[in-house]
């Protein structure tokens, strides 16, 4: 089926379902939308009934102009499951999506089968000033993307990608990596349905109140944590901290990859996800 809309906790949420089998819900990260799963969506739909959606304040979902919290995002995810009559699902989150999934797992363990966390945080590692700088950079990024999407994307890629992959994208922007995506595709995705300055502020508010470290030991679900060796945004050490606190968790480090490891190392990441979710 194509994209659909549902009224979730008073907010119109856009979602898409594809594939058959056990349900798998994908939760995207900050400033992104459901299209961020370009390297995962189709490969995973060959094995699962995959649901991807735009968080409130992102993509084609409604963008109520008030500060968001991680619990609000988790409640939306739970309510979407109820709307779709899904009692239990695997749930996967990348970056901010991984933070939402951790919050969701603490509050709604009965709704989860297995958990996959990719390049995420159990708490904001800096102070309020650091968060303010991050917010200002993201708002500047919004204007840069509107002005020159290509330049803005490759500039941002310095932080997100391992240097050799970024270099290859710049040299050959039309190359289809793993038959799944090109740099041109990623530039297009990064510049459509942009999170506006007020959306950025509302999403960042969720980070400012976020710390689940003390609650992670309550998560009993089997959990796979995929960290990236060269991640400069959600460092490997933070994913190791999550692993140390979730009792039934397994940590795999993707080598020679940055925060964008689901793209840089798509076949490897997808294989880890599929094997973990399919295993008894």
List the model feature ranges, each with a label.
Residues 128, 150-205, 214-215:
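Conserved alpha/beta-hydrolase catalytic His-Asp/Glu region
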Residues 4-66:
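Conserved HGGG/HGGXW glycine-rich cap/lid loop of the alpha/beta-hydrolase fold
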Residues 113-147:
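Flexible "cap/lid" loop of the alpha/beta hydrolase fold
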Residues 98-109, 115:
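Short glycine-enriched nucleophile-adjacent loop
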């Amino acid at each position: 089926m194509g994209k659909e809309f549902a009224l979730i906790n008073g907010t119109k949420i856009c979602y898409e379902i594809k594939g058959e089998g056990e349900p798998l819900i994908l939760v995207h990260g900050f400033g992104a939308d459901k299209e961020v799963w370009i390297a995962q969506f189709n490969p995973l739909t060959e094995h699962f009934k995959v649901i991807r959606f735009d968080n409130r304040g992102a993509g084609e979902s409604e963008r109520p102009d008030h500060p968001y919290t991680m619990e609000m995002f988790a409640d939306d995810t739970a309510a979407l499951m109820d709307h779709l009559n899904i009692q239990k699902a695997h749930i996967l989150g990348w970056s901010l999506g991984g933070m939402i999934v951790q919050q969701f797992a603490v509050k709604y363990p009965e709704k989860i089968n297995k958990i996959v966390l990719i390049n995420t945080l159990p708490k904001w590692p800096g102070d309020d000033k650091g968060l303010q700088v991050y917010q200002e950079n993201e708002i500047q990024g919004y204007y840069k993307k509107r002005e020159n999407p290509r330049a803005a994307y490759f500039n941002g890629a310095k932080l997100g990608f391992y240097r050799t992959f970024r270099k290859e994208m710049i040299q050959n922007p039309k190359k289809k990596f793993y038959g799944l995506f090109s740099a041109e595709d990623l530039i297009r995705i990064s510049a459509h349905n942009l999170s506006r300055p007020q959306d950025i502020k509302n999403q960042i508010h969720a980070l400012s109140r976020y710390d689940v470290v003390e609650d992670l030991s309550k998560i009993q679900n089997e959990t796979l944590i995929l960290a990236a060796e060269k991640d400069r945004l959600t460092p490997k050490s933070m994913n190791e901290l999550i692993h140390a606190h979730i009792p039934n968790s397994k940590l795999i480090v993707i080598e020679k990859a940055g925060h964008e490891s689901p793209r840089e190392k798509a076949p490897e990441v997808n294989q880890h996800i599929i094997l973990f979710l399919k295993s008894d």
